[in-house]
Amino acid sequence: MDHVSSLPDEVLYHILSFLTTKEAALTSILSKRWRNLFTFVPNLDIDDSVFLHPQEGKEDRYEIQKSFMKFVDRVLALQGNSPIKKLSLKLRTGFDSHRVDGWISNALARGVTELDLLIILNLVTLKLNSVRVDWLAAGDIFLPMLKTLVLHSVRLCVDNVNWGGKDVNVSNASLKILTVNYNICLGTFSVDTPSLVYFCFTEYVAIDYPVVIMQNLFEARISLLVTQDQIERARAPNIDWVEDDVVLRLVNMEKLIKGIRNVQYMYLSPNTLEVLSLCCESMPVFNNLKSLTLKSHKSRGWQAMPVLLRNCPHLETLVLEGILHHVTDKCGYACDCVSREEKGCSLTSCPVKVLEIKGFRGTIKEMHMIKHFVNYFPCLMETNIYIEESGPPKLRVPQVCEFIAEMMEHYGKSSSFNVQLLVGGYLYKKWTAQ
């Protein structure tokens, strides 16, 4: 009697998990009992080297490649939606990138928690969400054709060591889209991606940014994660940058900002805007920037706003997602929070033509801020005010309309200047200067 075959299914699954997927599949010929056991193994080990051999002729190798891909497709189909723990994918020759995308997507959809990749030549798009990626000791992942890389809540590991606090280097000449979103503290972060057109970075501030090459960037979204302690230390007077490692880390953000200076569309979170207050003296000039979106929060300041607006000589659209912010004596040129003779001077050199105010609640402070912008932006042609939908406004819509009408009477602009009030995303009323 075959004593192994008499073991429970769970034990046999465990035994088969130590074999490659091809080796596990070969057990299906042993008996009916083994026919489909391999399809329930939670670990997939797909290695083209067990199919392809250097001595094979070119035509034979092509047929073997096709057979290999059909084998992988069949295994995944037989497994259906059963849970999977680990996918080990080792490909040393070119394959249909859409096929490979499908294999990885299949594993991700089935809840894979460990992804093991080795040299994939033709992969164009790779999106990883909430998985652990094991960088093999045998070599790096080589993706020369990659154009889109999205990492969301991904644990990058080397020899089972979490990359939190480690140096991260992304280098790819063909990559077009890069999204990094994870709440860990990095060591250094370098990115050498000359073809990149979209960059989304949601991270704690790294220790340093030694290399930042993104000269063809079209859109950037920077959302730094900082602690309240870091903010307080950044605001402290007489900061000693050399002695304070926390502040020095924040100051090094200037290297990342300089690396994206060719961008045309840029979004900055409240934390990012506050941290930039430490980089005002080294703020780059954004010669290509056409649209700037700034998100505000009542606990974060606008200290960097004056120099940022001055350094956008071709800015056309300014989007403010909220205009209430932490008041300091350093943001006054860009707003009217603090009374001073020179108020508004940083706005007079800004060529912005379209101003969008989102999340408007109708407070007196907000209305004064809008008046301030309308008065000091010399090239302003259009102002769009979006009423906040997530709560009752401080004033009723008719009162807001009265305020806008009065503002249009007292603040003379070109006859082509107009203000639009939008409620729920729809135009409620429009005013045009007389």
Swiss-Prot record:
Q: Does the keyword Calcium apply?
A: no
Residues forming the F-box domain are: 1-47
Name the PROSITE patterns for this protein.
Answer: FBOX
User: Does the UniProt entry include the keyword Repeat?
Assistant: yes
Which sections of the protein are LRR repeats? 125-153, 157-182, 265-296, 297-322
Q: Which InterPro entries match?
A: F-box-like_dom_sf, F-box_AtFBL13-like, F-box_dom, FBD, FBL60-like, LRR_dom_sf
Keyword annotations for this protein, in alphabetical order, are: Leucine-rich repeat, Repeat
Output the SMART domains linked to this UniProt entry.
FBD, FBOX
The family database entries (Gene3D superfamilies) matched by this protein are listed as: 1.20.1280.50, Ribonuclease Inhibitor
State the name under which the record lists this protein: Putative F-box/LRR-repeat protein At4g13960
Q: Which organism is it from?
A: Arabidopsis thaliana
